[in-house]
Swiss-Prot record:
InterPro entries: PCMT, SAM-dependent_MTases_sf. The active site is at S112. Its main location: cytoplasm. This is Protein-L-isoaspartate O-methyltransferase. Keywords: Cytoplasm, Methyltransferase, S-adenosyl-L-methionine, Transferase. HAMAP family: PIMT.
């Protein structure tokens, strides 16, 4: 069992030290939600100890809220209803797992908020049913687990050794390690030996989309990624020819930065 990322000081508040890295600057919480409906907030479980008994109900409530927020792809919604998000975060934060919030997973990284996961996956899957998908930035493994519910071949690359090990343990616990090929490496380079991919999902923001990733899209394939530094937007790119791509800008977001190389 992983150590809790925070500890309560008696007031019910987790310590700043325990939540190191969990700040708006490295959260992928959306900057603006003004255009989205505002459903009733989800009431979290009383404690992580009894969350297992309530997780099915909480996941269904989360999925219903995502539907109210405009996610309509049943493949994505069914997949998110099937994956226990609370098992991908520290026990100290498990009671918040089904809130629409990014949560810290260590190494100054976060698990993406459910709306962002659903939005990004739905966008790249809208035009086709992808059979081979690349995820750049495995993190704790949650998004890869969601993809594995309906995608035949999922490849997920993580540059931080500690997160790679965390994702591997989480996927193994759910018996998904044979359905997700997890790679420790530089995500900006993709996985050229496995390309082309029907879809690529990038879970970190760069100033520009790496050309290596664009080159690894199959014809008609789609890539989605946050782009920018202090001001970021989701960008959806579709490959339309051998050397041509179509680009569309979507919502404002905030993600951790995309970095090259690996971190041991």
């Amino acid at each position: 069992m992983r150590k809790p990322v925070g500890s309560k000081d008696g007031s019910g508040v987790y310590s700043r030290q325990g939540l190191d890295g969990y700040t708006p600057a490295n959260s992928n919480t959306r900057i603006s939600t003004a255009t989205l409906p505002r459903p009733e907030p989800l009431r979290p479980a009383a404690s992580s100890a009894n969350l297992g008994l309530n997780s099915d109900r909480l996941r269904l409530a989360m999925v219903q809220r995502l539907r109210q927020m405009g996610i309509t792809d049943d493949r994505v919604l069914d997949a998110m209803a099937a994956v226990p998000r609370h098992t991908f975060v520290d026990e100290a934060l498990a009671s918040r797992a089904y809130e629409d919030a990014a949560l810290p997973i260590g190494h100054s990284q976060t698990i993406s908020q459910p709306w962002v996961v659903a939005r990004m996956i739905a966008a790249v899957c809208e035009a086709r049913a992808p059979s081979r998908v690349l995820e750049v930035g495995a993190g704790c493994g949650y998004q890869a687990a969601v993809l594995a519910q309906f995608v035949r071949e999922v490849h997920s690359i993580e540059r931080i050794r500690g997160l790679y090990e965390l994702a591997r343990a989480n996927l193994r616990a759910l018996r998904l390690s044979t359905r997700v090929r997890l790679i420790y490496g530089d995500g900006t380079q993709g996985v050229p030996g496995v390309a082309p991919f029907d879809a690529i999902v990038v879970a970190a923001a760069g100033l520009a989309i790496p050309q290596a990733l664009l080159n690894q899209l199959a014809p008609g394939g789609r890539l989605i990624a946050p782009e920018g530094s202090t001001s970021q937007r989701l960008v959806l790119i579709e490959r339309t020819g051998t050397a041509s791509w179509k680009r569309m800008e979507l919502e404002a977001v905030r993600f951790v930065p995309l970095k090259a190389g690996i971190q041991s």
